[in-house]
Amino acid sequence: MNQDTICAIATAQGGAIGCIRVSGLDAIEITSRIFTPARKGKKLKDAKPYTLTFGHIHEEENIIDEVLVSLFRAPHSYTGEDSTEIMCHGSSYILQKVLQLLIGNGCRLAAPGEYTQRAFLGGKMDLSQAEAVADLIAST
């Protein structure tokens, strides 16, 4: 399986809230480079899985957005890899800026269907489930 850490916008355009998923070996580390929890002394890597951490996405000293970040540890995630989900404001500018920051810190943009491919290859779903996800995506 590919060991790259990938990222992609997971929500439709035009919504009030957007979600960016990050998955791979370095997902938590890369997300931590651009995310600072609001609670002083708290670190994303120490957060409990399946919880939300409130904080800020930043570029150097500049705050880009207030966000919630959820943490999923391997193998208990959609892909079976360490993963984070960044819930931010849904404007195109914010979503693209967060993607650029993730890519600049070591992620690469996910190919269409790559999250599902990783889930299938990681034994998280069978072929019929993967095909159903592909059909659902193609129908929109």
Question: Which positions does each model-derived feature cover?
Answer:
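A glycine-rich (often HGG/GG-containing) alpha/beta subdomain
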Residues: M1-T140
